Amino acid sequence: MFDNNDNQGQLGLYFHWPFCLSKCPYCDFNTHAYENVDHARWLSAYLRAMEFYAEKTQGRVLDTVFFGGGTPSLMEPDVVAAIVARARELWLCDDGLEVSMEANPTSVENSKLAAFAHAGVNRVS
């Protein structure tokens, strides 16, 4: 998947949160309507994957972290904060690092958006 000799250039990370409050009839993405998500278990899996890929991408500069889905705005802000913090530890980061999150306006309130901003999210779509 990665050429260890190709350690130049920018790098983007994508985190897929496959959960939604309900499955939209038009959606073809890998998503599931599930209320009881084990956030700690998902965080552990994301962090393990990050460790693996960090070894394969040494020397690359991280310029984007993207949370997509599903409905990633259903994630706990602490999970997002832990992922962003670990990404900053594992990779050199571009000064303008974009941390972007898809959000459904019906499933996120201002207080949660503020918590995501505190976690490092600087773009919501």
Describe the predicted segments one by one.
Residues Y46-Q58:
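A short, N-terminal amphipathic alpha-helix
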Residues C20, Y46, F67, M101, ...:
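Conserved, mostly hydrophobic/aromatic
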Residues L62-D63, E76-S125:
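Radical SAM/AdoMet-radical enzyme domain recognition
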Residues V37, R41-A45, N104-S111:
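Glycine-rich anion/phosphate-binding loops
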Residues M1-L13, Q58-R60:
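N-terminal [4Fe-4S]-dependent radical SAM core
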